[in-house]
Structure formats: C-alpha cells, structure tokens
Amino acid sequence: MELQVVGANNALTVSETTFGREFNEALIHQVVVAYAAGARQGSRAQKTRAEVSGSGKKPWRQKGTGRARSGDIKSPIWRSGGITFAAKPQDHSQKVNKKMYRGAIKSILSELVRQDRLVVVEKFEIDAPKTKVLAQKLKDMALNDALIITASLDENLFLAARNLYKVDVRDVQGIDPVSLIAFDKVVVTVDAVKQIEEMLA
C-alpha cells in the first residue's frame, strides 16, 4: 500500500501488515489499560495497628471503671489508631507480550491511516528552538493538536514544543499506544515511517 507524502508529488510504499491491519479494539484496550496500569506509582502506604507507634499497655483495667473495655490505644476504632485494612505498596504493572504490544501499535497506525489522521512528511524540522516558529509551522499545516514523530529526537523541535498545548515531539523509540491515540493528528517523517516498519517487523 502507499501513503501520500504531504508537500511532495511522490507516495511512500509501506507494508500492508503494519499500516493496513484490521482494527482490533479488544487488543488495543488491553494494551492501553496495561500501559496506564504500569504508570501507576503504587507507593501508597498506611499503618496497621501493629505498625502504629505507641505503647502496648492496656489503657485501663478490664472491669470496674464504667468505661468500655479497651486493650490497646492503637486499636483501629480509636482516634490516631491503626487502619483496619491498611493499604500497602503494590506493583500494578501487567504483563503484555511483545507480539500483543506490536499488534496494538500496528492496529492503531492502520486506523490512523483509515481516518486520515496520519500525516506523512519528507522532513519536519526548525532552525532554532523557538516555540513561535514551531507554532507558525503547525498553523501553516492546519495542525493544532498533533504528535510529531521523527527518526531521531530533534532537540530544536523538542524544546520548541514543550510550551505548546496539545503538541508533543517523540522519536520512534518513544512512541506508545496512549500517545498515538491521544492526539488528533500524528505527523511522521518518511525516515520515521521506515524505522517504525523495521521496529514492528
């Protein structure tokens, strides 16, 4: 299959298996959920009655005071006591096979092509790390919500895009399923397309 290169008369021949796959919603959902789960910090921690600092002495005798019986000031029903089912740090990451991950990326790229959201350009670069310059370049291309993918990370582009809303710059190694579906348009250079095909082969 062929992808039209914007601003050029030629088309880029690409692999049908990478850019022409069927849309697999279940697979994409599973991979995106796993990706989001892996980003969770999972470091929250509370103390049980065994871990709260304090005396283990019985506050008052069992009988004869008229008060409710109590054996421990660290009881969960007491103020500043322990937590009954205390949360502990945990790893939320889910295992995703390489074949599944690559399949999800291919499925997303193919759907982007079908929806005319994948914009292929010969090159995408600016002379200086100026946000104003990049903003104008995107405006000229009628883009205001875009992920820009280059073969290698362009420092000028990266620095210029940091202060632009809904604009991000990645190299091929930095793409992920969430970023691919988060933007309205995905701008990718010809060299980056070739690298993506090699990576997903």
From Swiss-Prot:
Pfam families: Ribosomal_L4. One of its GO terms (biological process) is translation. Gene3D superfamilies: 3.40.1370.10. Keywords: Ribonucleoprotein, Ribosomal protein, RNA-binding, rRNA-binding. It comes from the Bacteria. GO terms for cellular component: ribonucleoprotein complex; ribosome. Coiled coil: none annotated. HAMAP family: Ribosomal_uL4_B. NCBIfam families: rplD_bact (TIGR03953). Belongs to the universal ribosomal protein uL4 family. Part of the 50S ribosomal subunit. This is Large ribosomal subunit protein uL4. The gene is rplD.
